[in-house]
């Protein structure tokens, strides 16, 4: 079983040993109404309750004895934070990774000269949605909550805690959340001092060194709630970034993974620390790093667009008995890209490229069609992925193939746009839930079902034919990408002014 708790939705999937999904269940990951600028929160206990219902539903749908489920793996959105008291109860809303209330803390670290010191230890680029800045923000603004904190977890770790009653995380997840000294691959009092939260060092969970490590087993109480068999092994798992890579089998040389889900994730692996990367987190092999460039600006823009501006497509979809996304794909596909004038900056969910960036449409006039606006959103998302992938390429990490995962990977239209914008073959996998598959594979290895990752990939990961490139579009996209970058550069002054109120 793989559990993938995302920013938008949470999924539970049961796979057979050959990667076939035999049962699934899902629930929206409900966001609270914003209590303040930059707040992106959720009810920790309620989301666990919803996921536990999904676990039970998946077990029942699978029509197999619970004892036949060899193991459970868990992943979730990385970063953000879950606060527990000393008794293990959630004492405040959890924070999603898009939460940026702690921008002021980042600015404070930069003024104090702390920012670069932290980045040097964690081997990444600290941003406001990481646990350290959020915890410091609570210390400065909600001391009554901060003083009760007895445990710090990522949400995937909270799910494991509710399943096993074991307070643990894994090296990849907490390394990616910048809570680990990447020089020692362990916790660091110096790092906690730099964050300004030294008193929380003892609130850090047990650190499993491998995603495949069995950290505990399903308790009697969790068994009664979820329908899983008591004693079922639960693996340490990994952050969703790595889980999607594993689920896509993208461990080969010069193979990138692009996750076009709520976040814009772009990653590969090497034996090098890449300066100024979003993160260089612990990878599957010692001595190698997961080199990442990412931002909270991908499929979340499309989700917003369909909710706020997708009414026309929704009505047509109802008339034709199609999905709203199928109608939008048709609209996008009919747009002649050489005539497109509209641009979209895809920063609805979180700032990217610039700390104060917001989403914008540019160049709309009376001749602009609804289809062109739809197209500009898809292209804008592809452009932000290009921005990050180019960073990794320019750092000396070559790419010959990109495995595209996430919600937008289900669309052949989006696959084609990505391939032509990036000028790299896009290869999909025959699994719509690669994050869940990635941690299911880890659990399978931990439980002894697979010998190792290579054995699991050979048996469980099915790769599709690559999307063919249309090189006639390359000059058009190169020109439009250059203009898109220029527009964002021009907007920086305005964004900064607006951020001051």
Residues of each region from the PLM?
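Active-site core segments that coordinate phosphate-bearing ligands/cofactors
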Residues: 1-2, 17, 110-125, 133-168, ...
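Short beta-strand-loop/turn "lid" adjacent to the catalytic site in phosphate-handling enzymes
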Residues: 60-96, 125-129, 160-181, 207-212
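Gly/Ser-rich phosphate-binding catalytic loop and adjacent alpha/beta segment
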Residues: 102
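Active-site metal-coordination/substrate-binding segment of hydrolases
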Residues: 105
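Gly-rich Lys/Arg/Thr-decorated short loops/hinges at beta-loop-alpha junctions or inter-strand turns
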Residues: 29-41, 117-118, 170-175, 199-205, ...
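Carbohydrate-associated surface elements
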Residues: 99
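N-terminal glycine/serine-rich phosphate-binding loop of ATP-dependent small-molecule kinases
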Residues: 1-93, 148, 223-224, 228, ...
């Amino acid at each position: 079983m793989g559990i993938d708790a995302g920013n938008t939705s949470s999924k539970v999937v049961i796979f057979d040993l050959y990667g076939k999904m035999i049962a699934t269940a899902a629930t929206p990951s409900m966001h609270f109404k914003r209590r303040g600028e930059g707040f992106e929160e959720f009810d920790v206990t309620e989301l666990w309750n919803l996921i536990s219902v999904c676990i039970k539903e998946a077990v029942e749908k699978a029509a197999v004895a619970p004892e036949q489920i060899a193991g459970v793996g868990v992943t979730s959105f990385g970063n953000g934070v879950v606060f527990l008291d000393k008794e293990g109860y959630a004492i405040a809303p959890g924070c999603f990774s898009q939460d940026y209330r702690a921008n002021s803390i980042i600015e404070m670290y930069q003024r104090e000269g702390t920012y670069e010191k932290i980045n040097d230890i964690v081997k990444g680029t600290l941003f406001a949605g990481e646990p350290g800045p959020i915890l410091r923000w609570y210390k400065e603004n909600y001391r009554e909550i901060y003083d009760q904190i007895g445990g710090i977890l990522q949400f995937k770790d909270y799910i494991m805690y509710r399943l096993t009653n074991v307070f643990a995380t894994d090296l990849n997840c907490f390394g990616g959340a910048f809570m680990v000294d990447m020089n020692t691959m362990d916790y660091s009092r110096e790092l906690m001092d730099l964050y300004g939260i030294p008193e929380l060092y003892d609130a850090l969970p047990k650190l499993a060194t491998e995603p495949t490590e069995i950290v505990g087993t399903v308790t009697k109480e969790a068994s009664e709630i979820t329908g899983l068999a008591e004693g079922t092994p639960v693996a340490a798992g990994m952050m969703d970034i790595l889980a999607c890579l594993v689920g896509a089998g993208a461990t080969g040389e010069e193979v990138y993974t692009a996750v076009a889900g709520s976040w814009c994730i772009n990653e590969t692996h090497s034996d090098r620390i890449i300066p100024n990367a979003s993160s260089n987190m612990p990878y599957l092999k010692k001595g190698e790093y997961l080199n990442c460039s990412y931002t909270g600006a991908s499929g979340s823009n499309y989700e917003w667009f369909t909710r706020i501006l997708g009414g026309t497509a929704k009505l047509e979809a109802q008339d034709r008995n199609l999905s709203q996304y199928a109608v939008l794909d048709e609209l996008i596909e009919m747009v002649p890209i050489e005539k497109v004038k509209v641009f979209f900056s895809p920063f609805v969910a979180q700032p990217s490229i610039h700390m104060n960036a917001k989403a914008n449409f540019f160049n709309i006039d009376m001749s602009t069609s609804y289809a062109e606006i739809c197209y500009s959103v898809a292209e804008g998302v592809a452009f932000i992925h290009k921005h990050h992938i180019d960073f990794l390429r320019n750092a000396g990490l070559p790419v010959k193939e990109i495995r595209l995962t996430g919600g937008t990977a289900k669309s052949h239209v989006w696959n084609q746009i990505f391939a032509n914008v990036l000028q790299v073959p896009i290869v999909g996998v025959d699994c719509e839930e690669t994050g869940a598959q990635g941690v299911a594979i880890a659990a399978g290895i931990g439980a002894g079902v697979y010998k190792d990752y290579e054995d699991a990939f050979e048996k469980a990961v099915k790769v599709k034919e690559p999307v063919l490139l249309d090189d006639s579009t390359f000059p058009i996209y190169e020109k439009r990408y250059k203009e898109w970058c220029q527009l964002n550069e021009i907007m920086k002054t305005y964004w900064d002014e607006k951020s001051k109120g």
